[in-house]
Amino acid sequence: VEDKAGNVSHSAPLTVTVDTQTAINSIELVNDTGIPDDNLTNAVRPHFRVTVPDDVNAVRLSIDGGKTWVDAKRTSAGVWDYSWLTDVTEGAHTLTVEATDVAGNTVKETMSFTVDTTLSVPLIALDSADDSGVRGDELTRVNRPTFLLDNIDNDARHVTVEVQHGSTREVLKATQGANGRWSFTPAGDWADGQYTLTVKVEDEAGNIRQSAPLTVTVDTQTAIDGIELVNDHGISGDNLTNALRPEFRVTTPGDVNTVRLSLDGDTNWVNATKNAAGVWEYNWPGDVGEGKHTLTVEATDAAGNTATRTLEFTIDTTLSVPVITLDSADDSGNRGDNVTSVRSPGFTIENIDPDANRVTVQIAHDGSSREVELTQTGGRWHFTPDSAWTDGSYTLTVKVEDNAGNIRYSTPLDVKVDTHTSINHIELVNDNGVPDDNLTNEMRPQFRVTVPEDVTVVRLSLDGSGDWVNATAGATKGEWNYSWPSDVGEGKHVLTVEVTDAAGNTATKALDFRIDTRLSEPVITLNSADDTGVPGDG
């Protein structure tokens, strides 16, 4: 400033800044979840960060078109933050940011953002084409099964399947097909066992949903543990029976739900029934023919796996009736009368089939019985007592059992063991004179022999001549008679009697007798002392 006097004076310098504008450098949705910087969040209380020049001294925000404003807070030079204090509704929103600097300049910027908190819960199911057992039982015999994923929202960006098998866990990616449907198929074959699958879906907003776990069992095989012919008779386990209606028992794993059987080469099938113990049984309702048969068994488990096994078996209902006879060499009496004088007689057993596995003889004697098992020797069946039998009657019955369990009995054979006989009495029937003195005046003596009733032959011989004559059985049992047909000479004689019984036993006895046919003619005279007249005149 200069006055009239010419004085000049200077003020202190004044620096003035002309600032006619400000700016908003950036607006950031801090809790942008999911894909970064897509301004999509699942946070219902979004957090914003505004970057502005350092001279900005006020930042405010509005999401209702400027009707309502909230003030951001400066957190560092040029950085302002605000977290919404109340829930922001789902959907698209426009954020308006207004910044004011110290010069009073203002600027506004907008940012579109979306709040998305919804995501459907995914579903996973075994593909029906691979659900090989009962539909919906989550059991499959496919070792690389396909799973269908449903309820997958269109904004899903990650779809994975977690597979837990034993202690092994892996996370695998699902695949979206050309038709838009999601599915999952393992890259390699799964071993048999249980698998638990859980689907995890993440959308663009970062929402995550998991399906309920699905437990699936992979079962690619089954088995038939055993087939048993229940009415296997005879030798156990040889699959030989005499039952025309065989009964079978099939043992399988517990998950088998169908067992069927066939006897005609798989043309016709019948279904077995599972008992309370988990074993499958079937009794053939009609007669099955004699001979060899092949049983085919097919088992199907819950996963649809099948197993087949066969059993060869034979039905044998035939067995010959055995025959027992006394050995002819020991049939010592009349042939075929089964009476023997042998105390350890031999018996021949015939009509024994080749498949006989047990042959026994039951011997009944005097109210008791015992059984002896026989062994075939030299192709023959034979029985001889191991100790001498006492005299008496014995009944022998042969029992034969074959490999199929058939049993046949012989007709009982009654045998009598008789090892001795006797001559009870020899009588000279025409014993004249003094009784029983065996003195007769008959030139043709008559004899009576008393013997046991089983004696079949009585013969007589005189004086050791070696000539024998046969007596004749009398009307009374045990009495035999013989009258000599020709004259026997005077004097002493010895009669020899030999008897033979039905068993062939013999006994001999002798009788001494005498024939006396002579007697002098007697003479009588008067004693001479008393002959008083002429001597000799009587």
PLM regions: where:
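Short, solvent-exposed loop/linker segments at the N-terminal edge
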Residues: 34-44, 132-143, 234-244, 333-343, ...
